[in-house]
């Protein structure tokens, strides 16, 4: 075979390369992370936790505040991190660029050589009472990040109860009390091409309406369409919840935004529908499902973080204590395939 026939033409090479790159980023976006909460007694040391992430091939972590021990343990681990700015810091960081610069210097820049920061999440499920501080705090953190020469996206995490009129999902919109401060945030995220983080819990939808929501719809085990929406069909509650937020974004000028599911999971005891078996079913089905997107965003993997690594016995009410994939002794509560 001649050389001219044995080698692909430059246009073909470019096409093949673009397909490989697209496949890589789609796979990367679909990798599963796990949230590392610390509100529990007798939890393992941060170094042991990071070792457990690596042992289980968990490549992404969410950390709810700048814990020095955890950040130090993450050095050199190659685990990508969502680092939260606690909501209690919003007013201080919104009122002072100097304070925001200091926060980024101490908690991000100091670890830049060894920790892979993926997102800085400013505020978790911010309530309307402090929502007026959110945009300015995000802008000040963004200024500090860019001023330090860091390439880290800045976002915020919302709960799905910020939306209403969610059935069918295409009717979803933001509640008025959230819309007033979220719409400027949505505009900011769009201008920076940053995703919106969403804590998405089919369990809570099921828990609040067991008379009308069947367990199989929440666990990804329904055998047929449950919710028909013009142009879309829903066989699981996760997709319906997610797409209702996408619909709300479209109504608020954020149709270009991607959503990162920054929390989701299923408790093993403490309330209706909780069991080890249900949690195992939900989590393992979730991991497979998010590879393929949702009806409103088909074919694009959904970056997703499972809540949580461990049970946290300092939380209330009772069902909030039992979301962990692992016991404090690092033994798995049930089998999960992270691959």
From Swiss-Prot:
Cell location: Endoplasmic reticulum; Secreted, Extracellular space, Apoplast; Secreted, Cell wall
Induction info reads: By 2,6-dichloroisonicotinic acid (INA) and salicylic acid (possibly an endogenous signal for acquired resistance). Strongly induced by infection with the bacterial pathogen P.syringae pv. tomato DC3000. Induced by infection with avirulent and virulent strains of P.syringae pv. maculicola. Induced by infection with the turnip vein clearing virus (TVCV) and cucumber mosaic virus (CMV).
Any one Gene Ontology cellular component term annotated for this protein:
cytosol
Keywords, A to Z?
A: Apoplast, Cell wall, Endoplasmic reticulum, Glycosidase, Hydrolase, Pathogenesis-related protein, Plant defense, Secreted, Signal
From what superkingdom does this record's organism come? Eukaryota
**Biological role stated in the UniProt entry:** Implicated in the defense of plants against pathogens. Not involved in plasmodesmal callose degradation and in the gating of plasmodesmata during tobamovirus infection.
Instruction: Give a yes or no for keyword Hydrolase in this entry.
Output: yes
Give one GO molecular function term.
glucan exo-1,3-beta-glucosidase activity
- Per the UniProt record, one Pfam family is Glyco_hydro_17
* Protein's UniProt name: Glucan endo-1,3-beta-glucosidase, acidic isoform
Positions of the catalytic residues: 125, 263
Q: Which residues form a coiled coil?
A: none
State which Enzyme Commission number(s) the record gives.
3.2.1.39
Q: What is its main location?
A: endoplasmic reticulum
Catalytic reactions of this protein: Hydrolysis of (1->3)-beta-D-glucosidic linkages in (1->3)-beta-D-glucans
Q: Which GO terms describe its biological process?
A: carbohydrate metabolic process; response to cold; systemic acquired resistance
Q: Identify its protein family.
A: Belongs to the glycosyl hydrolase 17 family.
Q: Which residues form the signal peptide?
A: 1-30
């Amino acid at each position: 075979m001649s050389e001219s026939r044995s080698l692909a033409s430059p246009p073909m090479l470019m096409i093949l390369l673009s397909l490989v790159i697209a496949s890589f980023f789609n796979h990367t976006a679909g990798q599963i992370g796990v949230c590392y909460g610390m509100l529990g007694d007798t939890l393992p040391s941060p170094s042991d936790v990071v070792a457990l992430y690596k042992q289980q091939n968990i490549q992404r972590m969410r950390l709810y505040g700048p814990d020095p021990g955890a950040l130090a343990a993450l050095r050199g681990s190659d685990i990508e991190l969502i680092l939260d700015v606690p909501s209690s810091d919003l007013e201080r960081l919104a009122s002072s660029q100097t304070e925001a610069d200091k926060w980024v210097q101490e908690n991000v820049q100091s670890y830049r050589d060894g920790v892979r920061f993926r997102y800085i999440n400013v505020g978790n499920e911010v309530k309307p009472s402090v929502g007026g501080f959110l945009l300015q705090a995000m802008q000040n953190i963004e200024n500090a990040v860019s001023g330090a020469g860091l390439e880290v996206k800045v976002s915020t995490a919302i709960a799905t109860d910020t939306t209403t009129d969610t059935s069918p999902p295409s009717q979803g919109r933001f509640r008025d009390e959230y819309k007033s401060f979220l719409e400027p945030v949505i505009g900011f995220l769009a201008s920076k091409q940053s995703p919106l983080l969403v804590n998405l819990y089919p369990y809570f939808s099921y828990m609040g309406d067991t008379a009308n929501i069947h367990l199989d719809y929440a666990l990804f085990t329904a055998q047929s369409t449950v919710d028909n929406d013009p142009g879309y069909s829903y066989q699981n509650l996760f997709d319906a919840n997610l797409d209702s937020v996408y619909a709300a974004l479209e109504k608020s000028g954020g149709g270009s935004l991607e959503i990162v599911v920054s929390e989701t999971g299923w408790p093993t005891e403490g309330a209706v529908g909780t069991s080890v078996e249900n949690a195992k079913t939900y989590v393992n089905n979730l991991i497979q499902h998010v590879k393929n997107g949702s009806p409103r965003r088909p074919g694009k993997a959904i970056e997703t973080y499972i809540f949580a690594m461990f049970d946290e016995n300092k939380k209330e009410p009772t069902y909030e204590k039992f979301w962990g994939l692992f016991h404090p002794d690092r033994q798995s509560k049930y089998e999960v395939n992270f691959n």
